[in-house]
Amino acid sequence: FNALGLSTRDLVALSGAHTIGQAR
């Protein structure tokens, strides 16, 4: 993920947002 310029915090935020979006 470092190659994509994403940090662990960014990855968690994106994963959480994706999960919430899928739930809805």
Swiss-Prot record:
Q: Does the keyword Lipid biosynthesis apply?
A: no
Keyword Transcription regulation included in the entry's annotation: no
Q: Which InterPro entries match?
A: Haem_peroxidase, Haem_peroxidase_sf, Peroxidases_heam-ligand_BS
**Compartment annotation:** Secreted; Secreted, Cell wall
Q: Which domain of life is it from?
A: Eukaryota
Please list the cofactors this protein needs.
heme b; Ca(2+)
What residues does heme bind to?
18
What name goes with this protein?
Peroxidase 7
